[in-house]
């Protein structure tokens, strides 16, 4: 808590300094935001656990302060103030001008800069459905991308195969597909890892509706829903997984149940198609 307090105070002082350029310049000289030479010094860490995937690490003298919530708050407030990307890059992230994207993407603070750039774009395109993932010529919103990724997890599609399909190998070359698909790939990697490690009590398998349900009862309900064609999106809401981040979903007690439903939904598709065909034929007039 003390670390969080220190970081929040530091954040407030940084934001206040934006309104007075002289103070901002002075602050930039006296307070170092992460030395990019030290491995431990990162604004957004590349290696963290599932619950702390995104945290600020800012050096205050000999101290290192780190907190996920303050990172998000700092970037959001910088965005609200309309802080230019170049100023965030130089003053707050200490990232010098790079000649190539490959050099930039190797900088320890690159992920923070990339996140801020995405936030700016989303603000500019507020109200529009933004592309979260691209497969060939097909574009996916975040919601549709999540559904497709869940299908792959349920089918146990290898991470390496998804890596190839999303063309994220081109990330170092700044290809359009790689930049659009990087977040989708990270999301899939988290979900696939969680799926391979998850364990559930068969007597308290899923929590929804009236409370906990056994695996047997859950399966019976899910089979009925899958037969009826209840959409995956609806079940995500029923399991109270809507609106959660990829990490929050992966760590939620209902995530195994969601994957079970996705698999059943896919398995029952031939049955649904057959029933739909039968209903269509039954409605045709007899000649």
From Swiss-Prot:
- What start and end residues bound the annotated signal peptide? 1-24
Q: What induces it?
A: Expression is induced during host plant infection.
Renumbered to this chain, region (W2 motif) spans 148-171
Disulfide bond positions: none
Any idea where this protein resides? Secreted; Host cytoplasm; Host nucleus; Host nucleus, Host nucleolus
**Cellular component, GO annotation:** extracellular region; host cell cytoplasm; host cell nucleolus; host cytoskeleton
In this chain, the stretch annotated as Y motif covers 246-267
Location of region: W3 motif: 221-244
Motif RxLR-dEER is found at: 42-55
Keywords tagged on the record: Host cytoplasm, Host cytoskeleton, Host nucleus, Repeat, Secreted, Signal, Virulence
Region W1 motif: list its residue ranges. 115-138
Per the entry's comment, what about the domains?
Oomycete Avh family proteins have a modular structure with an N-terminal signal peptide (SP), an RXLR-dEER domain and a C-terminus with a variable number of modules that consist of W, Y and L motifs after highly conserved residues. The C-ter of Avr4 contains 3 W motifs, 1 Y motif but no L motif. The RXLR-dEER motif functions as a host targeting signal (HTS). The region containing the W2 motif, in combination with either the W1 or W3 motif, triggers a necrotic response in potato plants carrying the resistance gene R4.
Question: What job does this protein perform?
Answer: Secreted effector that acts as an elicitor of hypersensitive response (HR) specifically on plants carrying defense protein R4, through its interaction with this protein.
- Family listed: Belongs to the RxLR effector family.
Q: What is this protein called?
A: RxLR effector protein Avr4
| The organism of origin for this protein | Phytophthora infestans (strain T30-4)
Q: Report which gene this protein is encoded by.
A: Avr4
């Amino acid at each position: 808590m003390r670390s969080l307090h220190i970081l929040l105070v530091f954040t407030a002082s940084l934001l206040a300094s934006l309104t007075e350029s002289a103070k901002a310049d002075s602050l930039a000289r006296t307070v170092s935001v992460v030395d990019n030479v030290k491995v431990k010094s990162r604004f957004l860490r590349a290696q963290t656990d599932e619950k702390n995937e995104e945290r600020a690490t800012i050096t205050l003298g000999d101290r290192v302060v780190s907190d996920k919530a303050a990172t998000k708050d700092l970037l959001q407030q910088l965005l609200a103030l309309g802080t230019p990307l170049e100023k965030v890059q130089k003053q707050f992230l200490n990232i010098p001008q790079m000649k190539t994207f490959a050099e930039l993407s190797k900088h320890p603070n690159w992920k923070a800069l990339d996140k801020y750039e995405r936030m700016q774009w989303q603000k500019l395109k507020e109200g529009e459905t933004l592309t979260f993932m691209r497969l060939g010529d097909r574009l996916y919103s975040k919601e549709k991308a999540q559904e497709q990724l869940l299908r792959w997890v349920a089918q146990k599609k290898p991470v390496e195969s998804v890596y190839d399909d999303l063309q994220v190998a081109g990330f170092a070359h700044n290809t359009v597909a790689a930049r659009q698909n990087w977040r989708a790939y990270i999301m899939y990697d988290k979900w696939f890892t969680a799926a391979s490690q998850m364990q559930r009590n068969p007597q308290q398998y899923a929590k929804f509706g009236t409370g906990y349900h056994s695996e047997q009862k859950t399966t019976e309900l899910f089979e009925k829903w899958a037969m009826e064609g209840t959409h995956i999106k609806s079940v995500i809401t029923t399991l109270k997984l809507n609106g959660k981040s990829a990490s929050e979903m992966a760590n939620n007690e209902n995530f195994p149940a969601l994957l079970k439903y996705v698999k059943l939904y896919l398995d029952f598709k031939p049955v649904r198609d057959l029933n739909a065909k039968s209903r269509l034929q039954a409605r045709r007039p007899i000649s």
